[in-house]
Each structure stands twice: as C-alpha cells, then as structure tokens.
From Swiss-Prot:
It comes from Homo sapiens (Human). Disulfide bonds: none annotated. Its EC number is 1.1.1.300. NADP(+) binds at residues 50-56. Shows clear specificity for the pro-S hydrogen on C4 of NADPH and the pro-R hydrogen on C15 of retinols. The gene is RDH14. The modification Phosphothreonine is found at residue 5. InterPro entries: NAD(P)-bd_dom_sf (IPR036291), SDR_fam (IPR002347). GO terms for biological process: osteoblast differentiation. Substrate binds at residue 192. This is Retinol dehydrogenase 14.
Length: 336
C-alpha cells in the first residue's frame, strides 16, 4: 500500500513538473511583443469595450504604455473606475522605476458607461462620443459574454448573440463616421477559435426554438468574423481597416458561467495554469492589430498569435455575410 501511495505521489509530482515545464519552456506561442516605442500611439484615441478586466484590461494597459488616449467602454462604471485607478497606479509605478524616473509618455485613460446588452445604452454612448470626441483612431470590439444560461437582452435578443454581435454591430456602425474622419483608422474585432462549431441559422437567430449555450457562443463568434469581412468590403477605399482575431485560450473571468465540479477544480486550475494564456499574453494580437505598422492597410483578415491564419469556408461565405448584415441592420433599428 505504501509503495502504491508513493508511486501515485511521484506520478502526480512528475505530472505537475511536466506541466510546469510545458508552461515555461515548451513551444509557447509568441508570448509577448512588448518593447515597442513608448510613443507609438501618441496622439491616438482608442476605444476598448469591456476594458475593465481580462483581455480588455491588458490591452488597455499596453496601449496606454504606448502613449494612446484610451477610452474604456464598460457596463459597470464603478468596476471600470476601480480598474482605471489600478491601471493608473501600476503605470505610474512602472514609469517611476523606468530608465528615466518621473518621465512618462503614458497616455490618458477615460471611463465611459456602455452596456452592449442595451441598444439604448449603445446609442447614448455613441451620441456622447460624437459630441465629445473629435477623433477615434482605433475601435477594439473586445467585450463578450461566454456560455451563459438562456437569457435575453433589454431588446429581447438572446444574450450572447445580442452582446457579442448585435451590440458591437450597432456600436461600430454609429461610430463609422468618426472613424472615417479620423482615417487612417482601425477596427479590431475579438472573435474565438470556437467559431468553427457555430452556424448561422437565420430561422432562429434568437435561439427560441432550442438553446445550447456552447453552440450559441460559437454562433456569435462566427457572426463576428462574417461581420468583419463584410465591413471590410464596405470600407474599401476609405482608409479605415477592420480585422478579426482569436486570442487563444486565456485565463479570464469570461468562463464564470461554466460549472466545474468541486473535485475537478484543482486539476482544472493546474491545467489552466500550465496551458492557458495569461490575459497579457492573450491580448498581444489585439495590441498588434491596433498599433503595429506591419498591418497598416491590411483589412478583412483573421489573425491569431500576431499572424494571419486561414478561415473555414463557412466564415468566408459572402452571401451569408451580406444576409447577416442586412438582418442585423433591421434587428438593431438601423433600417426599418
């Protein structure tokens, strides 16, 4: 019995060490692209949805470091103000410890309330943006909801499709004029590898006939890609580019609706620590598409780990993309 117990302990320890090795010395994706010119984004205004936590917060932190003026569009203003305060303190401390203490090119950080589950909130937010912001250089559609129980938005849409696709669809369309007048400008859309498991069912976009939270998330992420490709077509010649990305598997609170049995949680935590990206790692492609001169003029492409990737045929179906666009215009009230 003692031998068996010792063997089990050694096996567990060996497994943990192997996972740790994979975490730190394995073939990890290009982990960080830091070290860019701190003034690269100086004078540029960037709007990031869902910037108070996870990928959005990490994206905001790096773009601030690069000198951007960052607007955090967040549903919970109190949490966003708290996150903004933490970011300011962290960046101030980093500047004080830098090669020239007290000298910082860190950009400005602004918090604005935006609830993508409410078209009324989206319209109010955009009206405020158009009244108060003279320019918008980068829009990052980052916010999202993941595999939640069935619920509806304020306007009666299935929550994942409503927030992940329709809310951002309206937001982007209402800000297009400002983006065009600020050109060259960029739109960055955060999708997911899980788009592969989704389909666009035009007969039940609201998932009222049946609801599978995993499938509906994948559908919304496929919609993000189709939206990006159709928008890129419509923006040809405007000097406004739009690209879409997947961040990989990232340790964020996006999966808060997923139930993990108590006995499995320790193993899940170990696996996520070993194999999942940190938010900073996951944000690198968003940062790259928002700031890098390498993608100047590039539009309608799909990226992962800061490089272009191929899409499945269903994500490149132009007729489906146009039909989705037309229906989305009606759903959000851009067309009657």
């Amino acid at each position: 019995m003692a031998v068996a117990t010792a063997a089990a302990v050694l096996a567990a320890l060996g497994g943990a060490l192997w996972l740790a090795a994979r975490r730190f010395v394995g073939p990890r994706v290009q982990r960080l692209r830091r070290g860019g010119d701190p003034g690269l984004m100086h004078g540029k205004t960037v709007l990031i949805t869902g910037a108070n936590s996870g990928l959005g917060r990490a994206t905001a932190a790096e773009l601030l470091r690069l000198g951007a003026r960052v607007i955090m569009g967040c549903r919970d203003r109190a949490r966003a103000e708290e996150a903004a305060g933490q970011l300011r303190r962290e960046l101030r401390q980093a500047a004080e410890c830098g090669p020239e203490p007290g000298v910082s090119g860190v950009g400005e950080l602004i918090v604005r309330e935006l609830d993508l589950a409410s078209l009324r909130s989206v319209r109010a937010f955009c009206q405020e943006m158009l009244q108060e912001e003279p320019r918008l250089d980068v829009l990052i559609n980052n916010a999202g909801i993941f595999q939640c129980p069935y619920m509806k938005t304020e306007d009666g849409f299935e929550m994942q499709f409503g927030v992940n696709h329709l809310g951002h669809f309206l937001l982007t369309n209402l800000l297009l004029g400002l983006l065009k007048s600020s050109a060259p400008s960029r739109i960055v859309v955060v999708s997911s590898k899980l788009y592969k498991y989704g389909d666009i069912n035009f007969d039940d976009l609201n998932s009222e006939q049946s609801y599978n939270k995993s499938f509906c998330y994948s559908r919304s992420k496929l919609a993000n890609i189709l939206f990006t490709r159709e928008l890129a077509r419509r923006l040809e010649g405007t000097n406004v580019t739009v690209n879409v990305l997947h961040p990989g598997i990232v340790r964020t609170n996006l999966g808060r609706h997923i139930h993990i049995p108590l006995l499995v949680k320790p193993l899940f935590n170990l696996v996520s620590w070993a194999f999942f990206k940190t938010p900073v790692e996951g944000a690198q492609t968003s940062i790259y598409l928002a700031s890098s001169p390498e993608v100047e003029g590039v539009s309608g492409r799909y990226f992962g780990d800061c490089k272009e990737e191929e899409l499945l045929p269903k994500a490149m179906d132009e007729s489906v993309a146009r039909k989705l666009w037309d229906i989305s215009e009606v759903m959000v009230g851009l067309l009657k």
